[in-house]
Amino acid sequence: VHSASMNFTGSYQKEVRRRVNEILRDLELQLPFANEFTHYAVSASGIFNEATADQKEKLCGKIYPWKRTRLVGDSITAFQGATLGRPGVLAICGTGTSIIACNKEEEFTQLGGWGPLLDDVGSAYWIALKCILASIAEFELTGPETAITPALCEWYEIKNVQGLIPVIYHPEFTRDKFAILAARLDKELGTTDPVYRQICRDAGEAVGNLTLQAVEKSGLDTSPLPLFFSGGVLQFNREAMKSFEATIRSKHKVMLSQPRLPTVLGAAMLALRDADVEITDNLVRQLETTYKNVNELLSN
């Protein structure tokens, strides 16, 4: 199991293929020489559910046998890790927002995940953008005063919100920096500024409504609803999480949990299933222990 940053559509194809090749070579060096690869599972953002044969060949061709490769969106592997492949729903809300639900017939429904330019509702990017717009509204006297404005002015050393425009339009001010800005605002204003708190409540409600739509569309009728959540907004933004949970609980009895396993182990589970390996509780514990030990070795 190995992970690295990959976006199938948001990065140059040559760069993504280079990363895939590096991951495979790194794995080969870590494993005993006699080991033979039989099944490959690769997850990448920018892919919805299962990749097409054309996508697999473009990404994996001449690196490893793409016909024996399972290439899926990162939401699919996140879901596998979260639920261990069982029926349920996973709400991912970090830099972006993606909801994935699976019913008893193992049919997947995915909503969101379109990226910031197409409005990932409730995401950290979305929150940061709404905060900047709230500061602009205050400046233009079309909205209430907010502590967001002095916070932005102090951090970016500007006199007013007009000075922020060259900053956010700079090519290096990526969507990840919007997400970092959202986290910084939450740390500074999380329980004090009413404008900021309302933005966070709106974010949680938007993600909750998207989750309800995914559940309804999937036909998932399990009660209580197995609902898993991940991503910085739902894990650390208290106002957003409270609003998200209240929105879901207004319609369903819920069993709310964090993912059982990390996304990278979801990819491992897909490969094991394709190799007809049964996913038992003991195997899950082994995966968890191995992952923990590897992380400890790397940190030391």
Model regions and ranges:
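ATP-binding/phosphotransfer module of carbohydrate and carboxylate kinases, centering on a glycine-rich
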Residues: 1-37, 82-87, 133-300
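Glycine/charged-rich beta-loop-alpha catalytic/anionic-binding loops adjacent to active sites
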Residues: 60-64, 68, 107-115, 246-255
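Gly/Ser/Thr-rich loops at beta-strand to alpha-helix junctions
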Residues: 46-50, 95-97, 234-235
